[in-house]
């Protein structure tokens, strides 16, 4: 409430502005000016009283003259002071004078100094409502005193100088006692001399100040009222100039003395209060925030007489927290109008209201120590505006404009014709009015405030006073139209209903309705009259007649023995009889409900054992009433109100949990309880005991699904019996809450299922016919749907059995079509609860919010909205359980069919409720990690108290913390970085070269698996300045890699800790969903982290997003992105992961614009082999001791021993790909004889060490492109239309996402070259890798073609020649020193490419092999025939699922595969006919043939012979220098259309094809070009005017 006074904050206003605009209280000059001042010392002594016990500073010593002389020589001279000086002023003014002389005084002959006499105002310093605040924010009072020019007074003969400066002025104004005796006298006049006698100045030659109040005028106001006094004083105030030159000392007790007195008494009795004149002087700083208004003197009263030295202060009126019952009494007890008392002075026009308003200061300036007590604001009633409620209603209704009746108003038929009773309730089937007596209970709480609450009286539990009609409105299904309605409310809400059956709608009503509908025309429809524009004219009224017939059913009582059919439609009479199954809560559910009852009664403080009638009433309190109590208890923000709020919330949670358990099982109740306990600590503490009991029972349900709810056992029996009779299709109708339990049951039974979980894009209802056309429904055994997804056109004829679980519904809710000739077997399961039992009472009055808005958790406009949202949580299936899959397309609305032998591992629901997770890297990666600093790591561990799970992982990624799947944090310390840089760089010219290493190596490796990188640099200012200078290099590198970079600089360890903790908290807030991560690393996580784009958090997301890893691998790429995107997994990481899984990894993963983007691998002397999936030091138990493998052993397999855990069951789960075996030099040096028998190696006798995917770019392949093995290439040919990737092969993973070749280094072409059987073979000998660089510039190749057999040289990742044939021993090879490299923080994953010197030094190692490589080549190089797809599929399935390989049995299969055709390119190369194509294609094929013949010539030479080309290191160096790291963009540059360029290109092609020297450097694999760097044009043929065609860029 705002008063009419101004609210001005004087302390926040600038001092200059206040000084210019504000004035002070102007007091008038006295009418009788004082007479000349005459000093009278006697009066001063009498005035202040004598001080008897004051001793002189040094007393006269009664000793001899000698001693006196001695003392006079030693002791300083004394100054004689008259004792009367102390009687005059006890405030130590510092000015002393004497009018007498002492005989022994040292200054007896000196003249008395001249004293300046001034006078102070008689009244205290008065102010208006304006204060001036100086720059020091001190409070100052100003009063103008005449300036007196006086020079400093110097005592004669002494060095003492009396200054007349600011100190004197402050002491003058610090007079603390100014009497006014006229208050104690009876007359109203004061003598003139009396005033001057009582207020004698202490100095001479002083003029009376202008700031003075006429005492006579003030005393004459004693006979006036308070209001007249105030305005009289205000009228006499005149403007007065102010002087802000002095800083005053304010008496605190004088300014705030009013706090000790009741202002109401002062104003009512017109008196002053007694106040002691003695006060302490304090500095003004302590009262800079005072709310000083003004000082007024009011005449005395007989009750309080005396002198007062304190002012009366005013403050703005405020509304106080008073007893609310008094407020109610004021408004409720006004029975008659009371004439207000009018004060005519208040409305006088002569009154200056503006000045009076300015006297009142805003309440915002009140003292913090409650020095001023706010006055209660009186309630002023405007009796002229007060009117009765009837008058208000009358005015409102009178303003309503009447609307004219429509022409069809008289045509309406009275609806009471349909009823024989006087009152009809069918129009409002869901409305009821219940009257309850509610009492107010007032309880005192903290701070003298009153808290009220509703107390349910005995009448509240009585039967509702109105009759509830359960008859639905004709032709409308109440449950379909009103989903949020409590379906159990009609059965359980009223425990006192009478048993027995009664007819709600008799047969006569149905007959009348039938006749009425037949007699009505199309225009008699109600919708036509309500809205003719939207009305639909029905040509056939039979549907309405049938709808009226369906309402002829009985409404039974809640007796459990009687079947109820209320609230829905039953099967058509033409169909078979409905089979009713009644179930009751099982013993384990009843035991848990008993625990719930104990906790419930404990909360309401009723702990007796027997369930009396009163306790039943307590248990049956409805959910709506409890929510009202929660809202009302939360009105007052006190501790008592909070306790009551959570008490009511616990009661409601127990009732809701019991309802879920009784109708949907323990599993659903556990999910709900888990959500509630995670919402807040009070709820978790209150439900801790119940949570333990439910969790224990829930764990036991995992072994036996039917223990969750007895209805599951009934459904299991129905399905087993129906399927045993040959019925293969079942339709399950249930609420979505029950879907999770149904799916668990079906998986345990080995049945596949689908669910219609999303609507069709063409309408509100799902179009099941579209699903049938797509072939989904016939695949699965069961279809799960909800009531909202059923339409009258639902094809129930496709199912042999229909099972509807009613849950809280007592009767079926679906009406089947009447036109069906054969109706399927229909089973309805109903749950029966005994109302006198605890289950029935706790479930009474509970509703479930099926509204979509409530499910999503929209904000409720109440203070307890979040609590209501948690209590209304519906445990729907939000995550995919094992055996189920989400939709792959938005237009599809059913999931993929489930296989019967899948694992039953269940992902716990509610990922959004689990704690957030951060990963700490415990492995040292070329720098000091955060975990090595104990103080920082302890603070990170302390985050677990705030709900953050801290997990340790030994990761090869050069990060300290992984805050989320997309965010990582790195910490660099100047000391460790400097030491490392000095040790590795040596005499490097740049001391910050490690910055460049971070930009090129670290950020590149992190860009695969993270989208945001946070770097914290800690060190001295010089180190930080150097980092900032080089920051542009880091930002440029991050921008080119597409990763967001944030850099922080810290000068101390504490600041570093603060930055890290802030980053963790920020990441937790941004990540809404988190996965629950185990403390130890699982085998699946260890496998996934070998991918360069998968970090531990991303791996956990992949494992948690579906039931199994195999299921995730089978998903399309779009579904993978959708599942991981909600956990903030970068889409690029998922793309790279999918590409690596499908095509394998590329070696040239760096940007093609850098010099390091070469396809050449580093040799064996390199510290890091170029692997696409590196496991680091994880799982050391998998490392084998053997480093070389004999080729005779490669084709022999034995059962797996060490990798048994990596392979799942024969149901088709994941098997470890042998492509990883050739990539990791630390882990996968294995002997296939003992380690990888289950891996899908090639058949015996056919080894394909060089099989790999051509590219990780999906655009390079046809849709049906697949593994690169020659044994499977024919399966992916385009001439096999009846076999595709999309076909699900039982027992094997999706071929679209998986490959099974033996893989070379990062990427190489697909080849089917056989491997010679050698005595010693090293899979990881890369010494000859650099010999395969070739001139591939300017050529265009069809990316859809695949290269088979011996088309191209083998991959640089493998050495085709034995180590004994090498010219140089491995020990003699030059090794690269670690000190010669730059500081590398990521040496295990980032490929290192050899330089020209390395290539030169290893060029002489090339040698050929004499052994015959192409034995049995005829069988592999034969013809292509159209092998039947069915046979292909059988053979492939046999190979991939075989547990062991026997050479004798696989030879026929090898021969059969040899007849499969090759790719178009392979066939063109082997063809003897000239290819009719463009010149560049012919030239390209000729070059391929030349290379093939050259290789054959080389292989025919003995092992000790040199290559035919006899190349020298110099030649190799020249070739490599010329063509080192060509940019892929050069391939796409437009060279122009002139003949010169064309001649050069043809000449180069001719030379390259004819020269055997160049062919050794040829590599058919192009470097992978990023999407953003690809050419914007494409090559195409165009015809010129002469009819010739040529290739041009478009």
UniProtKB/Swiss-Prot annotation:
Compositional bias (Basic and acidic residues): 1254-1265, 1402-1414
Keyword Nucleus: yes
Cellular location(s): Nucleus
Biased composition, class Low complexity, residue ranges: 1151-1165
Phenotype of the disrupted gene, per the record: Reduction in the number of class I crossovers (COs) during meiosis. Impaired fertility due to altered male and female meiosis.
Region annotated Disordered, chain positions: 1148-1180, 1239-1283, 1396-1426, 1491-1523, 1536-1594
Keyword Secreted recorded: no
Chief subcellular location: nucleus
GO cellular component: nucleus; plasmodesma
Domain of life: Eukaryota
Tissue specificity: Highest levels in young buds, where male meiosis occurs. Also present at low levels in plantlets, leaves, flowers, and roots.
Stretches that traverse the bilayer: none
Keywords recorded for this protein, A-Z: DNA recombination, Meiosis, Nucleus
Job of this protein: Essential for the formation of class I meiotic crossovers.
Subunit structure: Interacts with PTD.
Protein name: Protein SHORTAGE IN CHIASMATA 1
